[in-house]
């Protein structure tokens, strides 16, 4: 690798989340600010909501008031 063209790597970079959580990592930046982390993300906290949007066929059936028995 060529010398003098790569950014300086910092081993102790503080990552600050909007929820107040902080942790350290390595990066070429001196400080990182993130909006969401593993302490506040719904997937990791277990507070996620499952949304069943349904498919295009279900939307069509609902639009024309059909049921599975009506269609062969």
UniProtKB/Swiss-Prot annotation:
Binds the 23S rRNA. Keywords: Metal-binding, Ribonucleoprotein, Ribosomal protein, RNA-binding, rRNA-binding, Zinc. HAMAP family: Ribosomal_bL31_1. Pfam families: Ribosomal_L31 (PF01197). Binds 1 zinc ion per subunit. Signal peptide: none annotated. GO terms for molecular function: metal ion binding; rRNA binding; structural constituent of ribosome. Part of the 50S ribosomal subunit. Belongs to the bacterial ribosomal protein bL31 family. Type A subfamily. Zn(2+) binds at residues 17, 19, 37, 40. One of its GO terms (cellular component) is ribonucleoprotein complex. The gene is rpmE. InterPro entries: Ribosomal_bL28/bL31-like_sf (IPR034704), Ribosomal_bL31 (IPR002150), Ribosomal_bL31_A (IPR027491), Ribosomal_bL31_sf (IPR042105). GO terms for biological process: translation. Its cofactor is Zn(2+). This is Large ribosomal subunit protein bL31.
């Amino acid at each position: 690798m060529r010398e003098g063209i790569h950014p300086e790597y910092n081993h102790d970079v503080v990552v600050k989340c909007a929820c107040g959580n902080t942790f350290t990592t390595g990066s070429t930046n001196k400080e990182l600010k993130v909006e969401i982390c593993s302490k506040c993300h719904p997937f990791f906290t277990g507070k996620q909501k499952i949304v069943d949007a349904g498919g295009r066929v279900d939307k069509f059936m609902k639009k024309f008031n059909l049921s599975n028995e009506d269609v062969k």
